[in-house]
Amino acid sequence: MIGIIDYGMGNLYSVSKALERLGCPYVLSGDKEELEQARGLILPGVGSFRDAMHILNETGLAAFIRSAVENGTPLLGICLGMQLLFDESEENGPTKGLGLLRGRVVRFPGVTKTGEPYKVPHMGWNRLRFHRPSPLLRGVEEGHVYFVHSYYVIPGDEDVVLASSEYDVDVPAVVGRGCVFGTQFHPEKSGAVGMSILNNYVGIATGRGNG
């Protein structure tokens, strides 16, 4: 069973429907005791980094997530959920994240180095470029996936970047270290490529994808 962490800021419906399509049992909950029963966790997220961390800290879910990861429970952060895995964000003023991966979250400049303006948020389909092998990407093609975001991660350690995309700058699109994974894009809205990544994560969490 996969636990989708409900803290009031996730794209819960589309993630839960994607798991249903994969035939994967899940629980959608903000209750720590319920989530403790899950073999893997998904942290979705849409909205403000500062608001999300405030809720996670106030509800005790931030401490729960850190403890679960320390105990080896796989975790997948999606979109804002991926950004929350890192040390801090500059959105609405400096805010500490979960600190599970080193790095900080910054806003797209909106202007290229040559002075050309471009649209922020980044919204649309971009191709993945793989950098490192991972069980999360096993059998996945370097296809196009769907992004909606105004901020991106500058990693403290490039080794956590499993795949990137390009939108004026190099955007870490898939990250991972140990049992912690993240996608900046929405795998549940990214067609066959996204569903393959979600299916691999379910395999990692349930023990059929660790080989």
UniProtKB/Swiss-Prot annotation:
PROSITE patterns: GATASE_TYPE_1. Its EC number is 4.3.2.10, 3.5.1.2. The active site is at 79 (nucleophile), 186, 188. Gene3D superfamilies: 3.40.50.880. It catalyses: 5-[(5-phospho-1-deoxy-D-ribulos-1-ylimino)methylamino]-1-(5-phospho-beta-D-ribosyl)imidazole-4-carboxamide + L-glutamine = D-erythro-1-(imidazol-4-yl)glycerol 3-phosphate + 5-amino-1-(5-phospho-beta-D-ribosyl)imidazole-4-carboxamide + L-glutamate + H(+); L-glutamine + H2O = L-glutamate + NH4(+). GO terms for cellular component: cytoplasm. It is found in: Cytoplasm. InterPro entries: Class_I_gatase-like, GATASE, Imidazole-glycPsynth_HisH. Keywords: Amino-acid biosynthesis, Cytoplasm, Glutamine amidotransferase, Histidine biosynthesis, Hydrolase, Lyase. Residues 1-211 form the Glutamine amidotransferase type-1 domain. Pathway: Amino-acid biosynthesis; L-histidine biosynthesis; L-histidine from 5-phospho-alpha-D-ribose 1-diphosphate: step 5/9. Its main location: cytoplasm. Transmembrane segments: none annotated. It comes from the Bacteria. GO terms for biological process: L-histidine biosynthetic process. One of its GO terms (molecular function) is lyase activity. Heterodimer of HisH and HisF. PANTHER family: IMIDAZOLE GLYCEROL PHOSPHATE SYNTHASE SUBUNIT HISH. IGPS catalyzes the conversion of PRFAR and glutamine to IGP, AICAR and glutamate. The HisH subunit catalyzes the hydrolysis of glutamine to glutamate and ammonia as part of the synthesis of IGP and AICAR. The resulting ammonia molecule is channeled to the active site of HisF. This is Imidazole glycerol phosphate synthase subunit HisH.
